[in-house]
A protein has these predicted regions:
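C-terminal regulatory/interaction regions
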Residues: 224-275
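Core dinuclear metal-dependent hydrolase active-site scaffold
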Residues: 17, 120-146
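Divalent-metal (often Zn2+) His-rich catalytic cores of metallo-beta-lactamase-fold enzymes
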Residues: 182-230
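Residue-level marker for buried hydrophobic side chains located in beta-strands
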Residues: 22-24, 47, 71, 150-152, ...
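Conserved beta-strand hairpin/beta-sheet module of binuclear metal-dependent hydrolase folds
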Residues: 1-39, 143-155
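Metallo-beta-lactamase
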Residues: 44-54, 81-131
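Active-site metal-binding loops of divalent metal-dependent hydrolases
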Residues: 26-28, 51, 76-77, 136-137, ...
Length: 275
């Protein structure tokens, strides 16, 4: 696990160097200077769980730097790597134009010929089995390492920052789908992984326990948001963090799961369900 030291903080965004130049989710380009020159060999493939900037934002910059680099991503996410205009507009609405460069750095397009589109139907690539696991994002996939049994789950198993056991489900807009997420947790469980490899942050050595934790938290948060009381939801979310984590870790939890975004994603989910 490479700690990308996003915004100068440890334990927020991890990039997984698996083997032989394979990287799962390189993170944002704003954090690349913290780690890219320390690699023993050039990366040859990026395995993206999804295209959100905290996971995949550096892809275009890395492809430009390493001429043999291939990028694997779900077929629904591939067009947005090639032309990131819509992705950037969506992120700018969420974070504000004044914060985009500080948070994420350059988001460069990836040439189409360098992208391999995946279906997530159980195909095997680069020693991984790939399963489509929507819920956090419609194009999210999980990679099961067929050698180690580790499952690289992106955001599907939640945010859990050591040394604390608190699990938060990241639910930013616009594509959160609670029903799909719950189904995807069953898909991940069915892979019978040895460990879950989390982007935020580290490893979950007891996969079923972690999946149960994110399932419970997701259902609880969704129910709170459905009541329509934004202030009550945000108060409960903030209090949960502060009751468990020390102040330094609490900052990291909020960096990985900005509370207002968690409300916005679930509020949009319920609103669209009712349309």
């Amino acid at each position: 696990l490479i700690d990308t030291m996003h915004l100068g903080r440890d334990r927020v965004i991890g990039a997984h160097l698996v083997r032989d130049g394979l990287i799962v989710d390189p993170g944002p380009s704003s954090a690349l200077p913290n780690w890219i020159d320390e690699l023993d060999e050039p990366p040859r493939a990026l395995m993206l769980t999804h295209i959100h900037l905290d996971h995949a934002g550096a892809s275009g910059v890395l492809v430009r730097r390493y001429e043999d680099l291939t990028v694997y991503v779900h077929e629904a996410g591939a067009p947005h790597l090639v032309d990131p205009e819509k992705l950037l507009k969506s992120a700018t609405r969420l974070y504000g134009e004044e914060n985009m460069n500080r948070l994420w750095g350059e988001v460069a397009p990836v040439p189409a010929e360098r992208v391999v589109a995946l279906t997530g139907s159980g195909e095997e690539v680069e020693g991984f089995r790939v399963e489509h696991t929507p819920g956090h994002a419609s194009h999210h996939v999980t990679y099961l390492d067929l050698g180690s049994g580790d499952a690289f789950v992106g955001d599907m198993a939640g945010v859990r920052i050591p040394p604390y056991d608190l699990t938060l489900p990241p639910t930013p807009p616009p594509e959160v789908d609670v029903e799909a997420w719950l189904h995807s947790l069953e898909t991940i469980s069915g892979l019978e992984p040895e460990r879950l490899r989390l982007t935020h942050f580290g490893d979950a050595a007891e996969p079923e326990r972690q999946l149960d934790a994110v399932r419970e938290a997701l259902q609880r948060n969704a129910a709170l948001v459905r009541r329509g009381d934004r202030e009550a939801f945000l108060d409960a979310f903030e209090r949960e963090i502060d009751d468990i984590a020390d102040p330094e870790t609490a900052v990291r939890l909020r960096q990985a799961t900005p509370p207002e975004q968690q409300w916005l994603g679930l509020e949009r989910y319920w609103r669209k369900r009712e349309e």
